[in-house]
Amino acid sequence: MGCGIMKYGITEMVKTIDTKTRVVDVTNEIAKKKYQAIRDFLEGEEFKEVVIFGVYLWGNYTAQMLSKYADKVYLVDIHEFMKGFVPNNNSIKFLNLNEFKLKFIRGEVNPDLIVDLTGLGGIEPEFLAKFNPKVFIVEDPKGVFDVDIYEADNTYKRTAPFIEKAKVGVLKTYRKARVSKTSGTMTLTIDTIVDASREITSLDGVLYAIPNLRYYEGILFHENDIHKFLSEISQPAITISTLNDVLDEAEEILSNNINLIYSFVEEL
């Protein structure tokens, strides 16, 4: 969390307030909820070798947390520059997808836990089917029903090869009584901040509330600029123009919206 900053607006009667809660704080809270759902599903099991497919947006957090319960964690991503998110940790090794496939062909990887966070258009079911883990978990990217998203999704094709030979779980994330098109961490971050902004605007004395959001994926995947990405998501989540000091109410509204997010793993 940052510290709420108050400045004057056009006149001294109008104040401009930035929330203490930053964009990254919302993202981190969502990551914690998703990881806790995975941890509950694993029921305290420990693993020799874990493979996590997908660094963005919370694979790195998952790797760090699971490294406490595993001898080795491979964090695999199709984008080489994603290595910049991975801390120096002897138990976590980043591999781009081609490097990982080469290690697999050589028989150098044999995970007993696989976590697939790649979502829509992610890792191919045919490649996943070559493994024999004790546990397989895949993140279901779907949120509220959308015909095109449902047609593009292949979550259950990815789980099919493991149903008879492993413990299989599908990670699902929704917002209670709210609409989000996908369960993606960025989708949920944006929807949470936008909805909170609308609620803050309804407070007495508030002129407007602006979500401080950017096209973050453009910064990351088009510019490949991790430092700029991290700088942008470290900005206050919402800026408020107001006659009154509504910072505490704004923080409570943000917190309530974050608390609407619910993650669980459905066992197949």
From Swiss-Prot:
- The lineage's top-level taxon is Archaea
- Cystine bridges: which residues? none
This chain belongs to the protein called Uncharacterized protein MJ0489
According to its UniProt entry, this protein's organism is Methanocaldococcus jannaschii (strain ATCC 43067 / DSM 2661 / JAL-1 / JCM 10045 / NBRC 100440)
